[in-house]
Amino acid sequence: MKPRHKKLAIIASSVTALGVASVLVLNAFQSNLVFFFSPTQVANNEAPVGKSFRIGGLVEEGSVKRQADGVTVNFLVTDTAKVIPVVYTGILPDLFKEGKGVVAQGKLASDGIFRADEVLAKHDENYMPPEAAGALDQADKARKTVMQ
């Protein structure tokens, strides 16, 4: 093999290896990507059904219902405009309370119920995830506009 052919073979194999590595990295990145949606966006069918995402808002007052098994909890998440039912099986965070901020990660079932794999509660009375706070503000503005 001539030096020129060796050089071309090295360049071609390097480009191929770089391409394969890029595809693997992008695939791993996309599979770990989790989007945030507000209850209004979920109710408006903007959230994917059957794919993992996060929903955030407030736990609606009087909506927390524990099932007989002791670990399954049903509750409603609201952004003051729309309400989404959530089912979670597991131990809830200590700070999980009605009327407080929550972010749940899971999948929306075809029946419209969000099945959470993980529930995160705010860590003090002043904190709310920026996405949830923004969604609540937008929903509140929209609700006030409709009422006028």
Swiss-Prot record:
Places the protein is found: Cell inner membrane
GO (cellular component) term, any one: plasma membrane
Membrane-topology annotation of the record: Single-pass type II membrane protein
Residues noted as binding heme in the record, renumbered to the chain: H123, Y127
First-listed, main subcellular location of the protein, grouped into a coarse class: membrane
Ranges in the topological domain labelled Periplasmic: 29-148
Statement: the UniProt record of this protein carries the keyword Phosphoprotein: no
Segments crossing the lipid bilayer: 8-28
Stretches of the chain found on the membrane's Cytoplasmic side: 1-7
NCBIfam families recorded: PRK13254.1-1, PRK13254.1-3, PRK13254.1-5
Protein family: Belongs to the CcmE/CycJ family.
Stated name of the protein: Cytochrome c-type biogenesis protein CcmE
Gene name as annotated: ccmE
